[in-house]
Amino acid sequence: PWLQDPDGDGTFTWSTASIPAGNYEFKVAHGLSWAENYGAGGARDGANIGFSVPSDGVVVTFTYVLATHQISVKTSKAGATPDLTKAKAFLVARDLVAWPAAAIPAGVQPELLHWRLHWSRTGGLAVDEETVTGGSLADLWYDPAGLPSALLAAHPELAGYVALRVPPKTAQQMPAILKGQLAVAMYDVTGLLLDATGVQSAIGLDSMFSRSAAQRRYGVHFSDRKPTFRVWAPTAQKVTLLTWPAGSDPAAPSSAASRRVMTAADDGSWSVEGAPLLKNARYLYEVVVYAPSTGKVETNLVTDPASVALTLDSTRSVAVDLADAAFMPAQWRSTASPALRSAVDSTIYELHVRDFSVNDTTIPAEHRGSYLAFADDGVGMRHLKALARAGLNTVHLLPTFDIASIEEDPAK
């Protein structure tokens, strides 16, 4: 049979369920001849590689890496495709995993199956023909009571999933376990690997942390002129605050930044207190975290998800104190905010900051499409004033959050 490389990455595979139960040997040959062949250990002209098929109908997958000549073979039940890059299982609480019933072989009772939880802080979990390798593991047990009704009401997408319980000792370690790679494997009564998958953890993270984490204030907040920086990153292994002076070049390298290691709290948040001189400083978080997208621990530089100010094109967050009078328009001090007797008295006009003035030729070109247009006496503002005289009392700005993918430099 031909091994194929459909995605062109240099890894050739072939799978079949047609090999009867028994013991076999194989090797890989190039060009339909034995002139160039590879066997055990990837050695040229190496020994045949032995493997066993435990029963008829088992899927056998052969893999050959062209660059290294490494060869492997694994077996699994028909219909199952162990793949840790997928995430079919859900961690829904520190002691509970949801497994899709559709992934259980037809006609097999879940009581007769066996599951294991695997984890590694550094990643590197892999699947061979027998099990998930690397890291630590714990046995899971099937709970015939199923998933809690309250969970299913909140997450109807989990209907049809079976409940797997995590041992108490492992459950206590779950916040630390979630800082690395996580996988669940399923085996039959003989110990044959049937399936293996990665794990989605968002529901479990909410279950463990959301109540206490919601009591925190995130972003940067000032008290007695001192800023406190806080970010929620429960799966991070380390978080460091990087700061650059106020008004500094947003393109300044990270090597020029001041660094402050942040402290983790039990609710998944990280925080650090800064000095008054950090007012209006540019900053980023350096986050060390396991990334399922790459299968490795990565170091990422990210802006603050709770930013109240950012530099051009969102390259850096800015530590702005919103209570600072310097950011208050002078007119606000002498203009009382109108009060309505009841919300139903509102007459609301919705508008988009950009669309309000982007084509208004009665205001300076550099103000068009921006907040500055509201300070001009253009046709847009004259129209709003006319509406106000007619009874309009509320302006609702459509979403004004920062969109990092939109170019902000007018010159571009």
Question: Model-derived features: where do they sit?
Answer:
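Long, charged/polar, low-complexity intrinsically disordered N-terminal extensions
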Residues: 79-145
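Aromatic- and glycine-enriched glycan-recognition loops and surfaces
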Residues: 220-221, 266-270, 274-278, 336-338, ...
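Glycine-rich phosphate/pyrophosphate-binding loop
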Residues: 302-361
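Aromatic-rich carbohydrate-binding modules that target alpha-glucans
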Residues: 1-23, 29-52, 118-167, 230-280, ...
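Short, aromatic- and glycine-rich surface loops/edge beta-strands on solvent-exposed regions
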Residues: 26-28, 172-192, 281-287
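Extracellular beta-sheet/turn segments enriched in Thr/Pro/Gly and aliphatic residues
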Residues: 49-77, 206-210
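Conserved, mostly hydrophobic/aromatic
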Residues: 231, 285, 351, 397
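Non-catalytic, glycine-rich low-complexity segments
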Residues: 79-107, 190-236, 309, 313-326, ...
